[in-house]
């Protein structure tokens, strides 16, 4: 028998307890600008840390291979219904363990090994699972990649030309480092011209889509996948969505289970349900509107400070910065900013001469700082401090002065009260 006091983490494993405490301290003392990170609510974390962790539930609600699933069925049913309501669709699979798992399931459902897939190049802002040669999507399938035009927008002419030439079975519209707006209708027209399945990967913008502040893909795409963290502020996990296509929905069900997963993570599914409930509140729309305002506020300052922004600016929550003119690499800038209590990630830019481990760019975003309560004023300050460091990487005085200012700002805006 366990005791919550005797068998607490602190009493059982002080090394892990201390590591977690250090991470809690880091999250409080650092400004989080990684575009794919956010802060989950106490309610989400409470659900994820619940005794649902203990329950095996292979299958789907109402059709399990184990007994004793009547209560976890409630959690999964709520998660599905809330996801459907949030995105206005009639099918949602809440079982994928991650966005990559959701993408893999879609591949398995609609393609055969060797089929051609057209997706955004990783160097242009795509994702590993969109056909990168180092990923399953580029190894099992014949991957063709599109990029950006000279203005930093998706090169739709190239997409159409590649589709006509290679006749892909599936086209992927989505990104991990693109700051523009996707024209879903153009992608639909191109997909229809070659009879391809159109998949949207909305992992980065799902919260914006749900709030109605980013174009809705569902009138145009056959299927959409997303993560449940990032702009949705839920637990780390995946989600598959589609509308008015029961035949495809049936394929997605079996592609997840028994296709690529066994038992679902019921504690995570419960946490997803909580996050979807939070996202259905009117305050979530206000939050997403502020996410966009804060990204634009940083864009304005960074342009004034002479930092080039790929695509010329941002129309969503993220910015991809070309820091070539600073004389420093993305790797150097990421480390310097870390010492100054600003967390970012180095990122390749289009036609980057440096390796992905070094890069010439940085990717930043506004979701986490907006959750923290930052408004435009604070975001302008952060952007100026970021520029100070990026132009002076390795300058101990600049880094220390910046860190002190960031600590003061963080104390005024705690992550959790």
Curated annotation (Swiss-Prot):
An annotated GO cellular component of this protein is: cytosol
Q: Where does (6S)-5,6,7,8-tetrahydrofolate bind?
A: 122, 126-128, 355-357
From the Swiss-Prot or TrEMBL record, state where the protein is found.
Cytoplasm
Q: Which cofactor does it need?
A: pyridoxal 5'-phosphate
**Alphabetical GO biological process terms:** glycine biosynthetic process from serine; tetrahydrofolate interconversion
| Matching CDD domains | SHMT
> To which protein family does this belong?
Belongs to the SHMT family.
Please explain the role this protein plays, according to its UniProt record: Catalyzes the reversible interconversion of serine and glycine with tetrahydrofolate (THF) serving as the one-carbon carrier. This reaction serves as the major source of one-carbon groups required for the biosynthesis of purines, thymidylate, methionine, and other important biomolecules. Also exhibits THF-independent aldolase activity toward beta-hydroxyamino acids, producing glycine and aldehydes, via a retro-aldol mechanism.
Q: What is this protein called?
A: Serine hydroxymethyltransferase
Question: Taxonomic classification, please?
Answer: Bacteria, Pseudomonadati, Pseudomonadota, Gammaproteobacteria, Thiotrichales
């Amino acid at each position: 028998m366990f005791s919550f006091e005797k068998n607490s983490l602190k009493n059982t494993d002080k090394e892990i307890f201390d590591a977690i405490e250090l991470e809690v301290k880091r999250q409080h003392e650092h400004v989080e600008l990684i575009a794919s990170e956010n802060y989950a609510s106490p309610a989400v974390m409470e659900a994820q840390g619940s005794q649902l962790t203990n329950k095996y539930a292979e299958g789907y609600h109402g059709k399990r291979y184990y007994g004793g699933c009547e209560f976890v069925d409630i959690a999964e049913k709520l998660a599905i219904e809330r996801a459907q309501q949030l995105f206005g669709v009639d099918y949602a699979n809440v079982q994928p363990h991650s966005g990559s798992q959701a993408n893999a399931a879609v591949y398995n459902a609609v393609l055969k090994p060797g089929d051609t897939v057209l997706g955004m190049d990783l160097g242009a802002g795509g994702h590993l699972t969109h056909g990168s040669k180092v990923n399953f999507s580029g190894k099992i399938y014949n991957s063709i990649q599109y990029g950006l035009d000279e203005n930093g927008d998706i090169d739709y002419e190239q997409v159409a030309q590649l589709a006509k030439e290679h006749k892909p079975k599936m086209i992927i519209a989505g990104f991990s480092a693109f700051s523009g707006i996707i024209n879903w209708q153009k992608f639909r027209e191109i997909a229809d011209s070659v009879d391809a399945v159109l998949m949207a990967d909305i992992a980065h913008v799902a919260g914006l889509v749900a709030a109605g502040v980013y174009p809705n893909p569902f009138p145009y795409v056959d299927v959409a996948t997303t993560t449940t963290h990032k702009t949705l502020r839920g637990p780390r996990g995946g989600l598959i969505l589609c509308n008015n296509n029961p035949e495809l929905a049936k394929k997605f069900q079996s592609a997840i289970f028994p296709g690529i997963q066994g038992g679902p993570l019921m504690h995570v599914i419960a946490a997803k349900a909580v996050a979807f409930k939070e996202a259905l509140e009117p305050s979530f729309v206000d939050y997403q509107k502020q996410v966009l305002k804060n990204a634009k506020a940083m864009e304005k300052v960074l342009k004034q400070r002479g930092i080039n922004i790929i695509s010329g600016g941002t129309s969503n929550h993220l910015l991809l910065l070309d820091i070539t003119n600073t004389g420093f690499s993305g790797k150097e800038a990421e480390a310097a900013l870390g010492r100054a209590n600003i967390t970012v990630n180095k990122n390749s830019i289009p036609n980057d001469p440096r390796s992905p481990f070094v890069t010439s760019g940085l990717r930043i975003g506004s979701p986490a700082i907006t959750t923290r309560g930052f408004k435009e004023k604070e975001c302008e300050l952060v952007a100026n401090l970021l520029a100070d460091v990026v132009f002076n990487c390795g300058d101990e005085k600049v880094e220390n002065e910046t860190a002190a200012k960031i600590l003061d700002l963080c104390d005024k805006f705690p992550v959790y009260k």
